[in-house]
Amino acid sequence: MSTTPATPKVGFVSLGCPKALVDSERILTQLRMEGYEVVPTYEDADVVVVNTCGFIDSAKAESLEVIGEAIKENGKVIVTGCMGVEEGSIRDVHPSVLSVTGPQQYEQVVNAVHEVVPPRQDHNPLIDLVPPQGVKLTPRHYAYLKISEGCNHSCSFCIIPSMRGKLVSRPVGEVLSEAERLVKAGVKEILVISQDTSAYGVDVKYKTDFWNGRPVKTRMLELCEALSSLGAWVRLHYVYPYPNVDDVIPLMAAGKILPYLDIPFQHASPKVLKSMKRPAFEDRTLARIKNWREQCPELVIRSTFIVGFPGETEEDFQYLLDWLTEAQLDRVGCFQYSPVEGAPANDLGLEEVPDDIKQERWDRFMAHQQAISTARLQLRIGKEIEVLIDEVEEQGSVGRSFFDAPEIDGNVFIDGDHGFKPGDKVRCRVVDADEYDMWAEPI
């Protein structure tokens, strides 16, 4: 009497940024193509894969905690991701992990799964089809599109280049074909991500590739122009403030891509920026922001900043607050500086900022920026916006406008039952707003 072999089951935990999420999607897509079932609990899995984050100490602590939970609940754990470059640190705490690999090592992770629980030999990929767009961990109506790996910068607070390597741009034809598959599968919003989006193509000297028989340069401008032809929202993230950012503003003004720029400025004080090894042209940056908004009045700028960097004085911090007042950024995140093992900032010999002062400056920063964000959203009241519906709840619908990237920005709330479903795009009028969110009514 023959029995059908059990379907191999994998548990998966993805930690960290959207770039890591895309790595997880690639691994899961390959496993699904080989017939593995992805299960939501540790208990039901034959093996658990943990995709870690290693950017800052708190992220490493979370990664180690999750690995420990998986070992306790399942016992068979494979570790990958950014913290995987510190295999010794992981094995010191969790010596029983089965394997440890760094980021982007998709094949090694899949092979490690094979060693624990081999794929079924009778699996027929033509019966259990994986969708053309692959396995996605985001809702069906939006997706992250990773255009490159690594980074050529050497910011003193960052260890990303040591974890993910130098810039390696994906062929633009491959990127555009993936985007096309996503849109055909129902994706309404494409979020372009990388470590350094504006450097796309630098490593290959902006070589010309082909998409649907059409020549396209491997460069941010040409990529955006091509993406705009697909009919989805296109949102740019992790844009380093190179001069070529100016080139995409006309596309935003023309409505071809969303008028939204995610630019991590990190600070404004020339002295602190120099210590960070970031561009220290804060006055020129203000002029550029002014010029961008003259060309595209609807432009939304999101940024992130670090307070309490070694050597930051009260004068430096006040300079940052004054700069924020001038810049009038729309969406802003802020982190208190946390030393990262292996980061060049540890060896600068600068005076550490005490934790209580870091906290006090963070509180002041957030209060200062909240007032700016509130005032800018108040300007939207009475205006028409297009809203992409993310969720439908009992009280109404929750969506986002071009102002809002998923997870990190605000929401648009629409009260009442209007028959909407996730992925719908709805014309609305803004009726109220606070420092982060807007309330709107369908038109």
Swiss-Prot record:
Swiss-Prot/TrEMBL GO biological process terms: tRNA modification
GO cellular component annotations of the record: cytosol
Cofactor dependency: [4Fe-4S] cluster
Location (main, coarse): cytoplasm
Domain (TRAM) ranges: 378-443
The protein's enzyme class: transferase
Task of the protein: Catalyzes the methylthiolation of an aspartic acid residue of ribosomal protein uS12.
Protein name, entry field: Ribosomal protein uS12 methylthiotransferase RimO
Organism: Pseudomonas putida (strain GB-1)
